[in-house]
Amino acid sequence: MKIYITGLPSGYEVEHLVRLFYPMAPLTLTPPEAGEDCVWAEKKPDGLWAMVRQGDKCAERSAPLPAPAEAGGETPEFSLASLTYDLLRQWTGIRPPWGKMTGVRPVRLIHDKRAAGWSETDIDHFFLERFDCSEQKYQMAKAIADLQEPILKVGSAPKTYSLYIGIPFCPSRCSYCSFVSCNLDRDRKMVQPYVDCLCNEVKEIRRQADKAGLTLCSIYIGGGTPTSLSADQLRQLMGTVRQNFDLSKVVEYTVEAGRPDCTDAEKLAVIKEYGATRISINPQTFSDEVLAGIGRKHSAQDILDCYAEARKAGHDDINMDLIAGLPGDTVESFEHSLRQAIALDPENITVHTLTLKRASRIVIEDQRENDYADVAAMLEKCRLLAEAGYRPYYLYRQKNTLQNLENVGWCKPGHEGYYNIYIMEEVQTILSAGAGGSTKLVADGGKRMQRIFNFKYPNEYIQRFAEVLERKKGVADFYDHDLGPKASG
């Protein structure tokens, strides 16, 4: 199946709506040949037209051009995308649970509509009728928006910010992963120089934040796998954070402990001693067979042992990640993983849906052995979380996620992950340290934004570190002027 779009300056919306039905269909720039399987969408001078062809069967739809936008009409691209969606929904018999919505932040959309003065009835119509969103997904997004409102008031206070620190090292690469990360065994010599640079960047961030008059709200150390650092390197990094920031005023300090094959009692003790208030231990699954298949070098028992060590070290706010749709997983084994996580009684459980990243081994080696019809059934099992007293508190979506589904953070009341909410709803500045870091500067209630990018790869980050520090001066400049300097990537 190929995608061919013509007559528009950009076919972005059409392409991504087609991929709700055919996730891996390539976009072609030349018209399909006669008899070739394809979805063809075209804006013609006198109207819109869409066609789908598979084998010897074909269907098509047409519609007049929309009224001009200034007269209240839709854009031609959205109208063509809607026409194509309606055709493919009838053709395949599939109703995507989020309908025509391709955006990654549906909860943010609810916040924006409320802020713009829309009535709840108008918002309901927007989601359910215009975008064909299912009642179940919309009600979940709406409940999350309600829960987030008081938390967003804290995070959206003028000149508040969160600090993100990235550790791009892992003991091994998971098959579903496309993030920039380095193999610890291969790149071990790079780790200490990287940590040294990272500590200096943290100090520069504090200086720039002070110049701009910013107040730190939350801290998140993520990866990669932060516990791929040694205990001494964690002390060095977290000690630098403690020396440069008043942690007593921080509402949340998260460290992704991540994988049990590099997280031990000493590291867990260091993380607690140096001020972290929340950690994440991420099993992804409790099936040994699935763990082996995705390239994890540990067992389900290792996860249980790591969790017990974390509790022993005094960690009282723990998140656990699970992924629905991993190769080799089934509805039954996913339910087992979910029940196992609930039995451990962590404060947070985050359920991700597998995303098909083109740079991941799953896609490169075509390991997509699930037919994905079971993925929605896996997520239906999340009712077990609600029954156990957890409630959804943040939600986001990604391109090429199986069945156009979502990632949802669940928590016990009072244990919402503040940083997760702030970064997803884009209400505050995020100052990022480390390779691949993307600093996002926010002012005027989100009306003005700017990004400053760090170099993507750790070796380049180290070699060109002077440029990293120079770019950070754009933080204070952004708040001193109407427009900050542009940052090249």
Residues covered by each model-derived region:
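Radical SAM enzyme core and accessory elements
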Residues: 1-108, 112-116, 120, 413-489
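A C-terminal junction/extension of Radical SAM enzymes
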Residues: 35-36, 355, 359-433
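Short beta-strand motif preference
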Residues: 50-52, 165, 279-281
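N-terminal [4Fe-4S]-dependent radical SAM core
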Residues: 88-95, 115-163
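Canonical Radical SAM [4Fe-4S] cluster-binding loop centered on the CxxxCxxC motif
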Residues: 158-195
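Beta-strand scaffold of nucleotide-dependent catalytic cores
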Residues: 166, 280, 348-352, 421, ...
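Conserved non-cysteine loop/helix-boundary elements of the Radical SAM core domain that shape
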Residues: 181-380
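Amphipathic, soluble alpha/beta structural segments
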Residues: 214-215, 219-223, 233, 401-407, ...
